[in-house]
């Protein structure tokens, strides 16, 4: 592809040779003379001056460099779209593999690809242009919208409801029983039936080995446009809003309420029945045990305001030094104070 054509498709201002041929995209240090790269973080600006890439996606105000530049408002977004141009994932032709098991009461939309050893249970409704790769299982009564893409070994349990353009990566489990038990008269833990389904909106991505549990009663809900990373656990009856990002190894206890446009970074935790308001950011390894107002940035365990947390962490790192200073002050004070006798009188 000529660089000029790529610039047009990305809506970029090109400064450089429009006839230059490019055939791929790589990181700033790996890209070669026929590939493009991008700089979204200013700390990598020096690398752009040394890159071997044919062209670099940059912001409009970026200084001139030897390589051609494709100037856009959001280099990271342009990079994402350029990847979609150069990288074409495998195509899966419509059809049903002979080893697939499909209940006769299931409704399969037009253009579906049903891979090897897929199991589709009774009364399933699967929308048009779905792709189910090997060993995907849809339990009875599942309803799924159009353009569903399920990678190998993902499972959707009974009566769960998924919208359009949902993607499940490998090993995802939607609708497994929530963690509910009650102690009986003999002191044994008795399993609480988990009767409520999971309801997932449109354009939701769930990454590998994440789990979203079904509700005891009611529903577990995931809003439109939300993206869930690897190894995330969402407990029963939790509600997650729209366009929220939940990063790897995060855990939401049962009945958590997460708002819209929230970012839960890696290894964060939210206690049961807590509400996290719209636009909140939890920084890595934060733990929330109380409601969080909209727009807050929270850090630490237990979590509190990020600005206070940063000051506290700075102070914590200085504790050994402060302890030494305090010890010196105490010794100086002791040297200037009169000592007491055994009867309490001054010597």
Predicted ranges, named:
Residues 38, 95-305:
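Structural signal for interior beta-strand "rungs" in well-ordered beta-sheet cores
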Residues 1-99, 160, 165, 171-172, ...:
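Terminal amphipathic alpha-helical/low-complexity segments used for targeting or macromolecular assembly
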């Amino acid at each position: 592809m000529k660089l000029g054509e790529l610039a047009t498709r990305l809506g970029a201002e090109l400064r450089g040779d429009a006839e230059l041929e490019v055939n791929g995209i790589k990181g700033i240090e790996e890209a070669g003379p026929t590939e493009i790269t991008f700089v979204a973080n200013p700390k990598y600006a020096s690398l752009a001056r040394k890159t071997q890439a044919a062209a670099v996606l940059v912001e409009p105000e970026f200084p001139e460099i030897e390589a051609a530049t494709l100037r856009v408002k959001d280099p990271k977004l342009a990079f994402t779209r350029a990847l979609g141009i150069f990288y074409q994932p495998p195509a899966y032709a419509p059809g049903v593999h002979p080893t697939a098991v499909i209940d006769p009461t299931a409704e399969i939309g037009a253009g579906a690809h049903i891979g090897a050893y897929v199991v589709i249970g009774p009364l399933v409704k699967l929308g048009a242009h779905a792709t189910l790769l090997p060993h995907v299982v849809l339990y009875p009564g599942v309803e799924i919208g159009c353009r569903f893409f399920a990678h190998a070994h993902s499972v959707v349990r009974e009566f769960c409801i998924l919208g359009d353009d949902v993607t499940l990566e490998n090993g995802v489990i939607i609708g497994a029983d929530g963690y509910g038990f009650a102690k009986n008269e003999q002191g044994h833990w008795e399993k609480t039936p988990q009767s409520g389904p999971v309801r997932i909106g449109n354009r939701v991505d769930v990454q590998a080995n994440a789990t979203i549990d079904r509700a005891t009663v009611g529903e577990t809900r995931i809003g439109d446009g939300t993206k869930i990373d690897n190894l995330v656990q969402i407990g029963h009856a939790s509600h997650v809003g729209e366009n929220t990002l939940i990063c790897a190894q995060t855990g939401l206890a049962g009945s958590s309420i997460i708002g819209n446009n929230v970012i839960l970074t890696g290894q964060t935790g939210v206690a049961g029945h807590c509400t996290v308001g719209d636009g909140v950011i939890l920084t890595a390894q934060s733990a929330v045990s109380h409601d969080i107002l909209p727009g807050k940035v929270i850090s630490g365990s237990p979590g509190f305001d990020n600005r206070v947390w940063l000051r506290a962490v700075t102070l914590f790192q200085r504790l050994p030094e402060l302890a030494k200073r305090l010890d010196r002050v105490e010794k100086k004070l002791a040297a200037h104070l009169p000592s007491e006798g055994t009867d309490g009188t001054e010597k």
